[in-house]
Amino acid sequence: MTTQIFQLPLKYCASSFSSTGQRNYGASSSPSPIVICKSNGISDGLWVKRRKNNRRFGSLIVKQEKGDVTEIRVPVPLTLEQQEKEKQNRDDEEDEIDEGDVDPEDLKYVNEIKRVIELLRRNRDMIFSEVKLTIMIEDPRELERRRLLGIEDADTPSRDDLAEALEQVNDGKIPKDRATLRMLHEEMIRWPNLEVEVSKKQRGKSMYAKSTDTGIDPKEAAKRLNVEWDSAAAIEEVDVDDEQGVVTKVAGYGALYFVSALPVIIGISVVLILFYNSLQ
């Protein structure tokens, strides 16, 4: 173990044991050379260990070279990296303990919740954020029923607790609160029409695209908008009769031209009215 010698410029209080076994207290006004030993080593055959409940501070052993040996423990703040490392180690230890005590019933709940999330994604095209937002919304009918029945339980998990547990399940973790996990499981399996697959409507042109020749190829636009090729191929031309198509185009362009020319018509009308009044 390496040691370093420093000079203390300020007064410091030292406690030491004399040869008679009595402890002496005194203040030294002159700087004395001291040896500082880090707490992670061995000093004079004694192991120096930091207390487990004090994670934010280490300790130094300060020994005076001259005279009787003095031992002072000086708290030293840990760096941010050391604090983060200790926190990570503590979390890893807790995870190992939790993984060793997994309840089969909790594991069953987690698997069923994952299955419901997968069904919602496949049948309803719902992403995880939408499922989480739905869980966070409180049903007003349930609130009214509890109010009428006088059910007020402070220990009942809140909607935020359910959303947090759902996020843990989605991350592959098992929530520690069994009551919250059980309530979340009941909410998920009671999702209405879970097994029914909703028919997806085929994409078509908008009303503006139907009435106006935009000159845009849907497949080319889909490429630029990063839309899947299958979805772009599903956008097909609508079968419209030629006569109906001509009438629709004329009506579409006529309305557009009329709206554009309306300010000009108003301006000309105002000028003519003023000119007519000036002649009188």
Swiss-Prot record:
Keywords: Chaperone, Chloroplast, Membrane, Plastid, Stress response, Thylakoid, Transit peptide, Transmembrane, Transmembrane helix. Expressed in cotyledons, rosette and cauline leaves, stems and sepals. Residues 91-103 have a biased composition (Acidic residues). One of its GO terms (biological process) is photosystem I assembly. It comes from the Eukaryota. The chain crosses the membrane at residues 255-275. One of its GO terms (cellular component) is chloroplast. Residues 75-103 are annotated as: Disordered. Its main location: plastid. Coiled coil: none annotated. Interacts with Ycf3. Belongs to the Y3IP1/CEST family. This is Ycf3-interacting protein 1, chloroplastic. The gene is Y3IP1.
